[in-house]
Amino acid sequence: PSTGMPTKTEQADLLQAMYGRNGESPLPVLAAKSSTDCFDTALEACRIAVKYRTPVIMLSDGYLANGSEPWRLPDLSAIEPIDPNFATEPNHADHEGTPKFNPMERDPVTLARAFAIPGTPGLEHRIGGLEKSARTAAISYDPSNHEEMVHTRQAKVDAVVADIDDLEVMD
């Protein structure tokens, strides 16, 4: 929520970022430690968002936004590309053996769903913000499906935690 005043160095928006959504929707929250760290933090946020197909919040504050410090432009060729790994063909067969695209099929490690560029012939599917059935992508209000999706979202965040280095705290 905007107060008309940027967040100061206390990062008072942390709890809002962590819990300020409807229902149980955990997601990764990152924060830059300095002005020079903003680039790396934004890059990491993008990597996580694409790899795990989950929203990521990156926190900043007035101190970082208005601060300045020397920053060496990185060698862009040394940065590992972020591959969206778009689906380009059907990923399963229906009960008759016909190849179909199931957007709810998940990577077993990241739990990321298959994602096709909207409008790709043969890979059409429903997208939007309403919760979908864990298996069919049809909109679902079923309580057991909702519980499964809540656990899936939490498992994604847990996988992100396991994928990043431990936080180094400086005294």
Can you describe what each PLM-predicted range is?
Residues 26-47:
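Active-site/ligand-binding-proximal alpha/beta "capping" segment
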Residues 8-11, 35-39, 147:
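Conserved structured core elements
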Residues 1-24:
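Flexible glycine/proline-rich, aromatic-decorated loop/lid segments
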Residues 25-26, 171:
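Short, surface-exposed connector motifs at secondary-structure boundaries
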Residues 1-2, 34-36, 62-65:
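Acidic, glycine-rich active-site loops and adjacent beta-strand->loop/helix elements
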Residues 1-4, 29, 149-154:
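N-terminal start-of-chain detector that recognizes signal peptides
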Residues 41-171:
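Flexible, low-complexity linker and terminal segments
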